Amino acid sequence: MDSLRPRRGLLAALVTVAFPSMVLALASPARADVVARESFVPSFPLYANGGSGFAGPWRQGGFNAFASGYVPEDRSLCHPRLRNEGGSVSSVAHPSINGAIRDLAQPLGAGTVYVSFLVQPLGTLHAGVFNGFFGLTLNGSLGNELFIGKPGAGAVSQYVLENRGGFGQVLSNGSTTTGRSTLLVVKAQFMPGNDLFTLYVDPAASATEPTGGAVKADLDLGTVSRIGIYSSGAFAIDEIRIATTYAEVLPSGGQAGSSPGCLVEPR
């Protein structure tokens, strides 16, 4: 089984055994409106157990995911005026589906929640099985999953919302460009029956919530108890945030003291 493969002297493989006391300490959100955050800061010796708001470490998983070839990077993905710290996680293009999942300490299933993350296409766009897709999933209790990112069919050059697997695709105005970091923010409104999801692409950090976005209203997730990184293409992902307010998933600032800097983007 492939695993998260740290570079530069970090762990050689994903550690799946965690000490309960350490997990509980890491799983408690620092603020009431912050549900979870993952900046991919190394946490030796439990590398895959960093961040906050989770009930355990990252592990291989996802529909038809037979590998998890994600590599921790020393540097972060960055976005203007968005606070960042730690490193990031990347993957090359693969001939099979890759996936890693992580359980939330606080499941999502009522009210409004915001999810944000940074994503950057790498290598040759569309390389990898199923046109080199990549993104983040919200995994529901009814057998449904929301996919946020670059799809494997349809509008393969844009960021979308869709059912994991490609059904119900909703296009955004954001295009996928190799080497360019993009901030994706999803407003998830959980309600009886179908939920309502709105995707904002590259909103300004520290600004008010946008009035428009790509809207998906044909999916009922039930209760979301885990998130996933799901891909076959070359990309990097960073700064996953989940909170009950828009402001908390877009904290303003620059690099934190623990950050060694940003991945350089082409001009």
Segments from the language model and where they lie:
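Secretory/extracellular carbohydrate-interaction modules
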Residues: 84-156
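Short, aromatic/His-centered strand-loop micro-motif at the edge of beta-sheets
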Residues: 160-183
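Extracellular glycan-recognition surfaces and repeat-rich motifs
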Residues: 46-88
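Bacterial N-terminal signal peptides
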Residues: 12-25
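Carbohydrate-binding surfaces in secreted/extracellular proteins
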Residues: 40, 117, 177-214, 240
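Extracellular, beta-strand-rich glycan-interacting domains
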Residues: 38-39, 232-251
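Flexible glycan-contacting loops in extracellular carbohydrate-active proteins
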Residues: 210-241
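Extracellular carbohydrate-recognition regions
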Residues: 32-64, 251-254, 267
